[in-house]
Amino acid sequence: MKRVPIADVESWISPASERRPLAKALGAENVAINYFELEPGEQFGFGYHRHPDQEEVFYVLDGTATFETEDGDVTVSADGAIRFEPGEWQLGHNEGDERLRALALGAPPDSDTELTRECADCGGRQPTRIERADGEDALVTICETCGGETGRFS
């Protein structure tokens, strides 16, 4: 058994105010567990995405999460959960007025991610990759169609 206070786990660079990788801190090898805190207007992921071989579950602790899906928007309030099958496209946002706290669980833990973001140069959503910004403690999203930067996160 291993126990860890969430506040003791370092937050990683993310579109969310806080993303704390609990699985690593707990030594969990067969499931990814991330703790998130999102201010109004923030999102869980770097873009609309899917994991071809991973199912993903979000449990909302406080606030309300809105998930953009292929079937339209779905809201999940505090003490509610949502599951995405492997290959389902989704992106969760905090469209409310209060802070959103949630846990995200994924299995298997190591999974490829297919990611799209809006590209101003190409127009519309385009396949995207994530890179570390040169000389900065930041991540950038790059359009794979034109090479343009579509987002910067620190």
Locations of the language-model features?
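A short, N-terminal "cap"/entry segment at the start of jelly-roll beta-barrel domains
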Residues: M1-A32, V140-S154
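A short beta-loop-beta micro-motif enriched in histidine and acidic residues
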Residues: A28-V31, Q43-E56
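Short, conserved beta-strand element in jelly-roll/cupin
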Residues: F36-L38, R50-E68
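Short acidic-glycine-tyrosine-enriched beta hairpin
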Residues: E70-W89
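Ligand-binding loop in jelly-roll beta-barrel domains
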Residues: P86-R117
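Short, cysteine/histidine-rich loop/knuckle motifs that typically chelate Zn2+
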Residues: A120-G123, E144-T145
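Short functional micro-motifs and their immediate structural scaffolds
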Residues: G124-R129, G151
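Short linker/helix segments within small regulatory modules
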Residues: I130-V140
